[in-house]
């Protein structure tokens, strides 16, 4: 079964480049920043399972998940 997800985007609007395909600690950390618990490297970019469109941009994810009130 295909799991839904998205490629998250960094502060410049680019996907996160990765070189170690599959299980990838860097991508897992990135996906956590974007509010989901799991991701991996697919096709040279971090892919996050269950990442919703509203959290694809790191700016949106930060607004949605960071507890720091600055900028709200």
Curated annotation (Swiss-Prot):
Residues 4-67 form the LCN-type CS-alpha/beta domain. It is found in: Secreted. Expressed by the venom gland. Keywords: Disulfide bond, Ion channel impairing toxin, Neurotoxin, Secreted, Toxin, Voltage-gated sodium channel impairing toxin. Pfam families: Toxin_3. Disulfide bonds join 18-41, 27-46, 31-48. One of its GO terms (molecular function) is sodium channel inhibitor activity. GO terms for cellular component: extracellular region. Its main location: secreted. InterPro entries: LCN-type_CS_alpha_beta_dom, Scorpion_toxin-like_sf, Scorpion_toxinL/defensin. The keyword Secreted applies. Belongs to the long (3 C-C) scorpion toxin superfamily. Sodium channel inhibitor family. Beta subfamily. Has the structural arrangement of an alpha-helix connected to antiparallel beta-sheets by disulfide bonds (CS-alpha/beta). Binds to sodium channels (Nav) and affects the channel activation process. This is Toxin Acra II-3. It comes from Androctonus crassicauda.
């Amino acid at each position: 079964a295909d799991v839904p997800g998205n490629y998250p985007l960094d502060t410049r609007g680019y996907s996160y480049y990765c070189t170690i395909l599959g299980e990838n600690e860097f991508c897992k950390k990135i996906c956590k920043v974007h509010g989901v618990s799991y991701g991996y490297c697919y096709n040279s970019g971090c892919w996050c399972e269950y990442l919703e469109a509203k959290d694809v941009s790191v700016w949106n994810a930060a607004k949605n998940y960071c507890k720091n009130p600055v900028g709200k």
